[in-house]
Amino acid sequence: MNPVITIVGRPNVGKSTLFNRLTRSRDALVADFSGLTRDRHYGKGRIGERAFICVDTGGFEPVAKTGIVAEMAKQTKQAVAESDIVIFLVDGRLGMAPQDRVIADFLRKTGRPVILAVNKTEGMQSGIVTADFHELGLGEPFPISSAHGDGVKGLIDDALDSLGIAEPDEDELANDPNRPMKIAVVGRPNVGKSTLINKLIGEERVIAFDMPGTTRDAIEVPFERNGKPYILVDTAGLRRRGKVFEAIEKFSVVKTLQAIADCNVVILMLDAQQDISEQDAHIAGFIVEAGRALVVAVNKWDGLDAYVKERARLEIAQKLRFLDFANVHPISAKKGTGLKDLFKDVDAAYAAAMAKLPTPRLTRILQEAIEHQQPKRVGMGRPKLRYAHQGGMNPPIVVIHGTSLSGVTDSYKRYLEGRFRDVFKLRGTPLRIQMNTAKNPYVDADKGKKGKKH
């Protein structure tokens, strides 16, 4: 599971700037759930090959008693409680403030690991600017500039190293055909996740159940269906009650992000009797950005009249149109209707995510697509797409080689994606297109000559 790093500090010390820098990579997952997570932002960050979940909190005043400031303090305390390590950010230009001492005292009492980062140190002598902050008693202050990126990689590397977590090769684990498929059932509260989970698993087929200990402990439920092993990655906050599981914890963004990152296929649950919410769209966005195979289950379908059903279909098509690669299944988790077809699509989505795409066939499809519709000209020339090969699985990545590929428009990439999808029948999985422009050896040679001094 990806570790959780929470950034705390008094207002205007640069927390959001650091957060944005850490989650700026291609797979950044950023959301702001108003109300649910007031002034708390969640993102998936990456430094090199090391992935983590990052939480940006509001300006922290832990002694606030009333109003919005008190609510922000409450949210920050909750964020600290569910984190693996805390980055306490202070302002190196303004120096020590009374609030910093109060926050440091609070963090010490939580028992969470803390790294003290002194921000805005660009152009300053680090030894001088960090000297005052030693009195906080949180170890050696780490000088950084979140605006310029100075020291940020070292800060995160230190944070991850201090946790003593051996980072697995996620792609290698995910692509191991001998491992059972991992499924996550996600969705906002009260859409019927625990009901569906109990129907899918079946009381007699539960093999084991691990109770959670710390924030990092995954709740995984191995089970079998039609003789095939699966692992359910829980986001519903399940607890065993006799022979069934019940959801007794409130919705957790962190658990949802961790489950999505840790699984092979996501079942996104929607409520047919309620409008698509911003929260539904955020969760769907997490899934797409993480590159996970997806099946959409629209629950509580039974008993609806034809008008309401059609309205629900149209709303999903409109508000979640970026999920057009995924199949949508009307179900009743309570009655168990529609689950057979749902699970067929879970298997099909996983197969599509793990599909092997031969280079000769990819290149042939590419050339046929170009013959049918060429990319638009850029200036005097036109991008030249020469050949394609597979660059990864789960999700499938198609790498296209050629020249002047920076001029290929997003609409043309979507056109190519559609061609590859149609031929390889890649339903249920995101498909990534990457452009790889060939280097010009003559240009590189000229640059080398210009750089030499005689």
Curated annotation (Swiss-Prot):
Pfam families recorded: KH_dom-like, MMR_HSR1
Record flagged with keyword Lipid metabolism: no
Listed InterPro entries: G_ENGA, GTP-bd, GTPase_Der, KH_dom-like, KH_dom-like_a/b, P-loop_NTPase, Small_GTP-bd
Binding-site residues, GTP 1: 9-16, 56-60, 119-122
Assembly mode: Associates with the 50S ribosomal subunit.
Family (UniProt): Belongs to the TRAFAC class TrmE-Era-EngA-EngB-Septin-like GTPase superfamily. EngA (Der) GTPase family.
Protein name in the entry: GTPase Der
